[in-house]
């Protein structure tokens, strides 16, 4: 109900930012912080929302077992909502997920959602690159120029190694800019 959603919203976010004390906590801890209760053994909290983007803070990254659910009319509408939400609430360049066995839907989403990783039929926390997908195991996930990062790949150990390159002068004529850029 809307009162429960409001309580969770107020527990999870303060002044527009996630409550760092609830990041990574189990569902019962989050629910208790909101002054609510759930049956014993609850692992995931699903919240139905009516708005996206700037209008709904629950659309921001929560980093906990909270799933935000929003209805849509058509698949194309859902993809547009995902794009709008990322542009307004944050996450551009990071990761999106789609659960579909329709290759046309996967392609449609991949061509439109501005992310470095689109995970298909798997949870988005798997963007770090476990052995269950083809992504490189990451210490961090680059968001590319979409997210003001230099990389749009998973940041791996080799990105953290300093490399010195020795460049010797070539014994050749300089390139002719006129010919090169015609």
Residue spans for each PLM region:
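Flexible, acidic loop-helix segments that line cofactor/substrate-binding pockets
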Residues: 1-28, 57-61
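Substrate-access "cap/lid" subdomains that shape
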Residues: 31
């Amino acid at each position: 109900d809307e009162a429960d959603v409001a309580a969770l919203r107020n527990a999870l976010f303060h002044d527009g930012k996630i409550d760092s004390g609830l990041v990574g906590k189990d569902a019962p801890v989050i629910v208790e912080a909101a002054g609510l209760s759930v049956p014993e053994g609850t692992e995931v909290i699903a919240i139905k929302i009516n708005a996206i983007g700037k209008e709904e803070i629950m659309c921001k990254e929560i980093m906990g077992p909270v799933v935000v659910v929003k209805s849509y009319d058509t698949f194309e509408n859902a993809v547009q909502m995902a794009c709008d939400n990322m542009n307004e609430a944050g996450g551009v360049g990071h990761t999106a997920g789609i659960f579909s066995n329709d290759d046309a839907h996967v392609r449609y989403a991949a061509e439109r959602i501005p992310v470095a990783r689109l995970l298909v039929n798997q949870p988005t926390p798997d963007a770090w690159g476990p052995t269950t997908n083809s992504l490189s195991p990451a210490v961090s996930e680059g968001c590319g120029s979409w997210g003001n990062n230099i990389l749009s790949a998973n940041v791996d150990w080799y990105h953290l190694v300093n490399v010195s390159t020795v460049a010797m002068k070539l014994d050749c004529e300089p390139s002719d800019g006129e010919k090169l850029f015609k």
